[in-house]
Amino acid sequence: RRQRQMCIRDRPNVAEAMNLIGDVDGKTAIIIDDMVDTAGTLTAGIKMLKDKGAKAVYASCSHGILSGPAIDRLKAAKLTGFVCTNTIDQTENQKNYPEMTVLSMAPLLAGLIHAVEENSSLSEVLAHAFDD
C-alpha cells in the first residue's frame, strides 16, 4: 500500500495547505522533491508526517538551492537524513549542516557526455548512473 504526501500551494516558497493520504503511524517516511529553496514546504511536510506518527523521516531533492532560512529549518526539523545533489555547490551548507549527504553529479554528467560523443545510449548511462 502506498503512502503519498501531497502539497498544494499557490505561490513559490509558501506552503498553503498539506494533506496526507494514507497511514504513516509507526512507519518510515521518505519525501522526494525536485527542488528545495527555503525549505518551508519541505519542513511543513516533515512536521505533518511526524505529527501523524512517522517513526523516521528522510528527505531528498535533486536541486538544493537552500537559500535564506533553509539550513536552519532543516536542522530544526530533525530529519533522520537529508540527501541532495551538488548541482549547486553545497560546501558551505554542509559545514553548517553536516548531517546532509551530498551526491556528486559529475560521474553521471561525464557518462552522458561520453555517450553523446560516442553516439551510444543515454538510457544505458541513466540506467546504471548510481550503481556504486
Named regions from a protein language model:
Residues 9-97:
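PRPP/pyrophosphate-binding module of the type I phosphoribosyltransferase fold
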Residues 3-8:
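Short, small-residue-biased leader/transition segments that mark boundaries at the very start
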